Amino acid sequence: IYTVAKMIPDLSSIPEVDGQLMAGDVLAELVHHPDRTTEEVIEEYLKDRRSDIPDKRVQEIIVQMRFIDSYATSFFREQAVRILVENGIRVTAYGTGWDQCEWSGSPYLDYRGKVLAPEILPSMNDAKIVLNTMTWFKAGAHDRIFNGMLAKAVVVTDDSTYLRREFTDGRELVMFRRQELGTLPERVFDLFGHLERAQEIADCGYAAARDGHTWKSRAEYLNCLLYTSPSPRD
């Protein structure tokens, strides 16, 4: 949250409504109903207040307000780490802003500062558990998930429709819903208390990522779409 503030545009460029008030209301709605998309909530907000705004202008405003995605993501990311730390689970965190959290002095937070993206993969190789919180899309996956699996760690992540379709909670990875963040410490403690089971999840996750979720497998999938699917002109 502390680094996202730099992304806020000039909200006075949205004369149709009070941009600052809209940003706060939309963010509050996303925090309370995290299954909703930013686009959906902004459109609903605008239509409720100004039914005369053309669809094209609604789309432009949605683009201007994209920073709300990052705020919502940052909120849940901080809450996920915080609830683990406050329950006595040691978390190693990388990136900016963690030292500005009011709870950053906890002995259970091992903050190692900002690192370049290529340095994260070797760190994953040393981890037993990789915690992921996704950006605000609802039907996809972040590459951290597959990188964590390929590092042979147990991946603990918030869910999406895609992840629920591709994997089974407790088999290839551990999934939680943002609305049930309070259960996260219990899920992690369960992994600590059943190390053989945790290793089975890590092994299944590695096999699943190796067999179907590498860059090579993605390239083959795209190649299949491009060269074997019927042409739109046919």
Go through each PLM region and give its residues.
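Nucleotide-sugar donor-binding catalytic core of glycosyltransferases
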Residues: 1-138, 142, 160-163
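Conserved small/polar residues in nucleotide/adenosyl-binding loops
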Residues: 227-234
